[in-house]
Amino acid sequence: MEKLAAGLAGLRWSMGAFPLDLIVSRCRLPTLACLGPGEYAEGVSERDILLIHSCRQWTTVTAHTLEEGHYVIGPKIDIPLQYPGKFKLLEQARDVREPVRYFSSVEEVASVFPDRIFVMEAITFSVKVVSGEFSEDSEVYNFTLHAGDELTLMGQAEILCAKTTKERSRFTTLLRKLGRAGALAGIGGPGSMGATGGGGGAARPVKSKMPCLICMNHRTNESLSLPFQCQGRFSTRSPLELQMQEGEHTVRAIIERVRLPVNVLVPSRPPRNPYDLHPVREGHCYKLVSIISKTVVLGLALRREGPAPLHFLLLTDTPRFTLPQGLLAGDPRVERLVRDSASYCRERFDPDEYSTAVREAPAELSDDCASPRHARLCLPAPRAPGAVRAPGPPGRLGPALPAPGDSDQDYVSPDWAGVSEPAGGCAEIPYEELWVHQAPESRADARARPLAGPDLISFGIVGPPRHEPEAPPPPVPPKSEAVKEECRLLHAPPVPPRGGGSCSKLTGSPPVLPHFPKLQPVHSPSSSLSYYSSGLQDGAGSRSGSGSPSPDAYSLYCYPCTWGDCKASESSSRPPPGPLPSTTTQPSQASRGLSEPLSGRTPSLLGADTPVVKNYHSCPPLFKSSRPQKSFAPFGALNPFSGPAHPSGAPAASSSGSISTSGVLATSSPTHSPGPGPGPQGQGYSAAPSSSLSSSEWQEPALEPLDPFELGQASPPELELVRCQEPRAAGAPGSGPCLSPLGQPKAFEPEGLVLRQVPASLSPAALQGPEAGGTLLFLTQGCLEGPPGSPREGATGAGVRDASSWQPPADLSALSLEEVSRSLRFIGLSEDVVSFFARERIDGSIFVQLSEDILADDFHLTKLQVKKIMQFIKGWRPKI
């Protein structure tokens, strides 16, 4: 052992780690391996050298221990099918509920109609079946049942059978020959002549309906019809099971002959196995529940006190291991060490005994984590400039940024924060801390040093490691430059120029990082959001593997905005110039936000001649998305109804060249009205290029007093959100080229378009729900039109329609929560249905994807309500 230990200590290990399934498939077993860096396997330390022994198929029977009169269920154990001990069948609970019954015909079985029956003796039956009531075609139907066949009863039916009778009248025979006996005999037409033949005493078929029992034969996996006239012996218990009521039997014999679950007793002292982890003692009772097969890899940890056997489930426990250098190249020194280790373990380890040991079954993930919202999962902090994209339910995605205090801190998804992970030691971090107070210093630390803790679950790193050259992360610039860097990292556009000039002459495009930061799933922070509004009902989603930002990465933050969930971002340096408070669903925050007037802005930053126009941060609709996103906005800047009035301007590019809008933006302020300002030449309208699959939102960080703008990308070219901008002072900090991050910009002339405004007399009561806040905005269906003949005409045209004359649009996928409620009232649904949809946060993008099964089974709507909604989605409108 000393010589072997010295040889093992001198081994040099490979730089990369390989998954266990790859090692088993590529390497000749047995082989040596060592746990990879950052990997975890139960019972294995980083210093252990493993001998991967062999790969085996284990078939085990899952059983529960029975205690106190067979009512208390104890721990769950796995009994191998090769277990040598014997068991005795107990009186089953089903024997008391459903006593064994015997039947002598199919008709008797049909009168009782048990769930299943067993054939006690071989049965053969033949019947002549007619294909139709008005057809002479018939065929003989034969079937044979074997003793022991298990039949599951499915229902009853009737078949048309043909019986032959003797003709007693020659006149009838003559008429039949002439084809005139149809009215007398009930069967007419010349087609019957060939069937009967001529002459007296000929046989003619008579059709009759025969009841039968429809069953499924599990031996042949076919459905068959047993006529009631079929005679034979049947029972509710298998003949093999009845024979096994007496005597002692192995687990394999019980599994092959008895239907599970079944209660068994240990009648005598079982043989001992040194590898047993659960002692099976005489007198113990067990309930055999199910049978399962799994592929395991046997291994031994080579230690000075002796080899310690262990095993890994090949498809679930797949940690990564490093291999000795020279193993794959056939180094004779390494091969000799492998042979010596195998011979050393052969004397001290019996793989057959180890495979037949009784063990306590591991807890299944489905038992502890019935839903992904309660999964006990620890996600590591990012090791690269961006986060790791993790496959999983397409809930909310967001960049996983380190906390200010500790860059090595592991993260717990928000909905999982209530469940502690003892192995990972993850701290419970409130959801808001993931998005606010993001100091650049902590991010720089996270980029500089990798994560020290173990990677409990490896997302997206299956297979050999990729040795691609990665560009080093850029250094953290000063504050103003850090804002631009964070904008780029968070899929945000660069800061627009402060001057009022047109952006159409700028044709550049902002640089894209070589490796764009990927995103990590973050579930809903709000427990009030339901399953349907979270987007978890659809698991399909496209992934982009390129270095450029994925199209569906743009739609991860804003649409459809549940503005009640938005949180205002707090600046870590100096506050923005008079931002409006965020509008949330919490009464305390809402009342605090309404108490701050617009006049509280800094006079030096907001002059009297500057129009106080509330900038609308667009949340573009998501049309025909492959997966509905959950509504949320992590930064306050994404809340259309919170934050200061930002100027925004960007070139507009549309695939069709035409610009339209999904609504008319109407702005009214309770304290201020727009003052005189520059003419239309200083204003512009911006609309992002369209995408047929997803929408894009840009986040603005809260580190710059003069906030960068947000650019929203609408989905189809015929429905885009267009916003109004106000000029910025020339020479303001952050002025730079106005570049479109999504492609080549096109020139856009705004002189021919105008946004209709709401009259100042709009009541705040017109805005209900989370839309009500410090600044009143109202968005209605409409379109951008040319300038009216007079300013009065533009102000009073049709900005806000009366509620009674509201009509739902043809495309329902852009509806807001309030408009979905109005649509349901429009088609005449009751208020309880409307309130249910509002409570479930069903907006247009989710509304158009609802199916009849969801409406009927999950929403518990009546058939009429389901039909109304489905027809309404397909384009039906009631004629009023």
Swiss-Prot record:
<dbReference type="InterPro" id="IPR013761">
    <property type="entry name" value="SAM/pointed_sf"/>
</dbReference>
<dbReference type="GO" id="GO:0035176">
    <property type="term" value="P:social behavior"/>
</dbReference>
<dbReference type="GO" id="GO:0006950">
    <property type="term" value="P:response to stress"/>
</dbReference>
<feature type="region of interest" description="Disordered">
    <location>
        <begin position="461"/>
        <end position="483"/>
    </location>
</feature>
<feature type="region of interest" description="Disordered">
    <location>
        <begin position="527"/>
        <end position="548"/>
    </location>
</feature>
<dbReference type="GO" id="GO:0050890">
    <property type="term" value="P:cognition"/>
</dbReference>
<dbReference type="InterPro" id="IPR025946">
    <property type="entry name" value="CABIT_dom"/>
</dbReference>
<comment type="function">
    <text>Probable adapter protein that provides a critical link between cell surface epidermal growth factor receptor and the MAPK/ERK signaling pathway.</text>
</comment>
<feature type="domain" description="SAM">
    <location>
        <begin position="813"/>
        <end position="877"/>
    </location>
</feature>
<keyword id="KW-0597">Phosphoprotein</keyword>
<feature type="region of interest" description="CABIT">
    <location>
        <begin position="12"/>
        <end position="320"/>
    </location>
</feature>
<feature type="modified residue" description="Phosphoserine">
    <location>
        <position position="740"/>
    </location>
</feature>
<comment type="similarity">
    <text>Belongs to the GAREM family.</text>
</comment>
<feature type="compositionally biased region" description="Low complexity">
    <location>
        <begin position="640"/>
        <end position="663"/>
    </location>
</feature>
<dbReference type="GO" id="GO:1990138">
    <property type="term" value="P:neuron projection extension"/>
</dbReference>
<feature type="region of interest" description="Disordered">
    <location>
        <begin position="385"/>
        <end position="407"/>
    </location>
</feature>
<feature type="region of interest" description="Disordered">
    <location>
        <begin position="633"/>
        <end position="713"/>
    </location>
</feature>
<feature type="region of interest" description="Disordered">
    <location>
        <begin position="569"/>
        <end position="611"/>
    </location>
</feature>
<dbReference type="InterPro" id="IPR052281">
    <property type="entry name" value="GAREM"/>
</dbReference>
<dbReference type="Pfam" id="PF12736">
    <property type="entry name" value="CABIT"/>
</dbReference>
<protein>
    <recommendedName>
        <fullName>GRB2-associated and regulator of MAPK protein 2</fullName>
    </recommendedName>
</protein>
<feature type="compositionally biased region" description="Low complexity">
    <location>
        <begin position="683"/>
        <end position="696"/>
    </location>
</feature>
